[in-house]
Amino acid sequence: GAWAEVDNAATRRVLDIGTGSGLIALMLAQRLPESRIVGIDIVPEAVEAARRNAAASPFAERLEMVCADVCHYQPENGELFDAIVSNPPYHTEELLPPCAARAAARHTAALSFAALFVHARRLLRQGGTFALIVPAAALKEVKGEAMLGGFTLLRRTSVVTRTGKPPKRELLQFVLGAAPQVAVCDTLPLMPADG
């Protein structure tokens, strides 16, 4: 929510895939006072928490939390989104979390990167942006799926624990279609090199 670059004037509809408790959707609602934000998650308990959080916020009238599988989701009015954000599942099949609800929400078999890009393309307007966070080990796969889906990289931030260490996560922002400029790449250390 805080990292994704969104144009307040051009962004009227935003979709948060895998909204969980709704934190990213709430951050976007705060940043984009003219936008409607839809959070979607497959886990009913997460959606209930997101609905409670949205209702307690000053942005409640612009937030909608939906319990659905993005693979089958259709916006009520059929209108495409201007921006999509996602913190997608990141566990591989070999490393399932013990809790079943967390497994459903975080398991890559439930929503592969290929499927994520197919549905982002289906739900996003041409020229719209798609921002997501992925494990660094998945970068090549994600960039490949993005290219196959007609997305172009706009921005990449490698998240490292300390300067000089290999990245743990990658923050990526794509545009559906051709990018107006060369992608901006940077690094975000979580701690100073000497700390």
In which residue ranges do the predicted regions lie?
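Conserved class I S-adenosyl-L-methionine
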Residues: 11-18
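A short acidic, Gly/Pro-enriched loop at the edge of an enzyme's catalytic core
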Residues: 75-83
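Conserved Class I SAM-dependent methyltransferase catalytic core
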Residues: 111-167, 171
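SAM/dcSAM-binding transferase cores
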Residues: 164-195
